Swiss-Prot record:
One matching Pfam family: ATP-synt_ab_C
Name recorded for this polypeptide: ATP synthase subunit alpha
Coiled coil feature spans: none
Origin superkingdom: Bacteria
Originating organism: Sulfurihydrogenibium sp. (strain YO3AOP1)
Amino acid sequence: MSVIRADEVLESLNKQIEEFQVSANLEEVGTVIQVGDGVARIYGLEKAMMGEMLEFESGIVGVVFNLEEDNVGAVLLGSDVAVREGSIVKRTGKILSVPVGKGLLGRVVDGLGNPIDGKGPLTDIAYYSPVEKIAPGVVKRKSVHEPLQTGIKAIDAMIPIGRGQRELIIGDRATGKTTIAIDTILNQKGQGVYCIYVAIGQKRANVVHIVETLQKHGAMEYTTVVAATSSDPATMQYIAPFVGCTIGEYFRDNGMHALVIYDDLTKHAYAYRQLSLLLRRPPGREAYPGDVFYLHSRLLERAAKLNDELGAGSLTALPIIETQAGDVAAYIPTNVISITDGQIFLEADLFYKGIRPAINAGISVSRVGGAAQIKAMKQVAGTLRLDLAQYRELEAFVQFASELDKATQAQIARGQRMVELLKQPPNQPVPVEKQVAIIYVAGQGYLDDVSVNAIQKFEKEFYVFLDTEKPDILEAIRREKALTDDIKAKLDAAVKEFKQKVAF
């Protein structure tokens, strides 16, 4: 029988006392006093921060949206079914963050950056980045000077977009707004621009169709789709654009170029209005809260061209706004027009006439993109906007005038051919060197003897002719980025040779 010695017991007790550590986990908790419609009011979280993540006992995460005298208003990032009055809520001390990095390319994620495409978890994540960030200051920026080619002749010629610009696409529903955005993504293939498409409040079938289009043209390799569809909670629709912007900022801040498309900010404003009214914020014009301008300005100001010291990266934004019966003077359209660096206005009347893309060149403008346009395009498209405006004026005048002089007839004929030339089918972006070539050909009068109905056939076959027999001309335009006398002479000779070979 072993004897327990007192000194051994004492030594063992002393050792355990030395190794004993007191650990206290201090958490600030509150209680749900009201819940419903995706929002909750919580009592007891006196030190909660605006935008802080909260954890409910059911596992649901919420975000602090309102700080009031005796309670906190939170929006829920998920279903509120499992949240009950009296449920315990605890602070996390963290701001809402999402994964960023090249691992998101080719993926479809929800409004919180979680994959929803069935391809498994995200890989190659650089880090988690806060969703709400302050936009780069004036000192960190550089003026827009590099072109972002959309592949759409009417835009690249008359309303050029530069890297780091915010260009609004505005128009009624079903006028081709999303088509312009998707064509722009397709045209970035091989251009070193990473794209983020944010679908806000759209039908799931539409999102699937867009993803299929991008996959078909090999564009998903450099694109991330952030989808907060109409069946998702208003909170997800509200957060999705900020998540898309954060994903794009990773590329911008690491010396790369990114393009983010918000489709559309009208539904984003609806979601924000819904959350604000549910949390009893005072309504203003059209029942929107007073800070709805700041909602969009703080989002769009994050698009920027950074200076060389910070890596010269850029984030370009193409927000989309849907108007009602062409009313650009409504609250949200005027807000976003004043925030952005220009707008592309799509008109339903032009769309129904078969002029697609249905861009109204008269009221569409790019405030900073002119500095980014390549010299060759400036040379050929300098007077294009003015010529089209004069043509529209004459077209209206012709309806009342019986006899016209030859100069006016010639101007109308040239205008008709230009309008026909600027038409473009969807998902067929045109490289800038081909755009320069065809606009030069039209400007020099080589299309004046081609019937209006044959213009698009002429254009298509002329591109094939240049690709197969005169690739050196396209290469020279690509290389020089300007129309030298030598290139002009070669183009003149090429179009004459083409017209002799092919009859129109």
